[in-house]
Amino acid sequence: MTALVIAEHDNASIKGATLNTVTAAAALGGDVHVLVAGHNAAAAAAAAAQIAGVAKVLHADAAALADGLAENVAAQVLALASGYSHLLFPATAAGKNVAPRVAALLDVAQVSDIIKVVSADTFERPIYAGNAIATVQSGDATKVITVRTTGFDPAAATGGSAAVESVAAAADVGKSSFVGREVTKSDRPELTAAKIIVSGGRALGSNEKFMEVLTPLADKLGAALGASRAAVDAGYAPNDWQVGQTGKIVAPQLYVAAGISGAIQHLAGMKDSKVIVAINKDPEAPIFSVADYGLEADLFTAVPELVKAL
């Protein structure tokens, strides 16, 4: 039994979500191989070979794989699938784009968002916005799985010594072409990788107040900024700051929720955080039910005082 992890990378380095997915693959009990499909991605393949627990790295190199087009990556995975019992993808935007294509082409049922490996064919995954855990079993010979990265600790990025094997690149499917990419530059940590997150809700009242109140606290803590869906929908924060079931799933060491009531959809995206601090003037706010520390106070007074204390 051998599992293949489809690495997420930028052709130069391996993304953190891959490390969590390797941990999930290792829990299956067999060998773990990693596929690095890209262009001029030798550095990423070398980095994958250093990941603890990886037995082999497969490196497919072609111009058609340079930008991670889902159709071409799926074709590459399909070309290798017969040699593996499990195909694992991080449950990121990229992984969720490729995995269903692979499952459909293999005519198997995808197992999505797993948070625990029970056995080689049985897994746990959250349902109903995380309010229940489903145990699912797959009878397919090849199991296509997406891994909720917050459910598994990352594998060590160093300490491994896997061999890197070049494999033939699949032909360009030709169904899509890469047009361009707009990358947002920020001095703050990336939201899903941040160790500390300061999030704001609709109670902040405006984009100006959102930034005025929360930015000093985030600066003091070296934190990423997040937001509830209500705050994003109101225009207080950009879409890529949204935390929740329809946003980003996070599990930082510290999550500070200011003016967030705690709708079930938001809780689904952050309740695995190690320490949760909630600031809200409503004592009945649902956010207090998951908070480790709760401060019943007006955030416009409490947050500046907290900044001063830090």
Model regions and ranges:
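N-terminal glycine-rich FAD/FM-binding segment characteristic of electron-transfer flavoproteins
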Residues: 1-310
